[in-house]
Amino acid sequence: MEKYNREEFEEVIVDIGRVTKVVKGGRRFRFTALVVVGNRNGLVGFGYGKAKEVPDAMRKAIDDAFKNIIHVKIKGTTIPHDVEVKYNASRMLLRPASEGTGVIAGGSARPIIELAGIKDILTKSLGSNNSANVVRATIKALSLLKS
């Protein structure tokens, strides 16, 4: 496992969820956080954290994200080729785009694409729009790219 300089990376919170457990004395709340980190130069990762308080969940998610960093192959400002990936019920389609197109991505796929440093890309999220699964499908698709 490589050590990364955390100052070089940006963090984006994709999703914060609240989970409720009903007990005899009332409701107990716990929080989950889904975070994406990237250096806008080919390194990107995601992490998932759970805790009783939101800041603790975010910290755990950021720590987890640095353990799951992948290197993305970038060709100019876009990706080298089309890729389609399925993760659980989510399908993700990534296509290279000509220069000047910009990032065409919705929901939780956009921060991953931007933090990876890709400037021009077409993406389509098919099937489930569960943010955790879309993030995992996008990361899986980016990891399958070959230069």
Curated annotation (Swiss-Prot):
One of its GO terms (cellular component) is small ribosomal subunit. Keywords: Ribonucleoprotein, Ribosomal protein, RNA-binding, rRNA-binding. It holds the Pfam family Ribosomal_S5_C. SUPFAM superfamilies: dsRNA-binding domain-like, Ribosomal protein S5 domain 2-like. GO terms for molecular function: rRNA binding; structural constituent of ribosome. The N-terminal domain interacts with the head of the 30S subunit; the C-terminal domain interacts with the body and contacts protein S4. The interaction surface between S4 and S5 is involved in control of translational fidelity. Belongs to the universal ribosomal protein uS5 family. This is Small ribosomal subunit protein uS5. The lineage of its organism: Bacteria, Pseudomonadati, Campylobacterota, Epsilonproteobacteria, Campylobacterales.
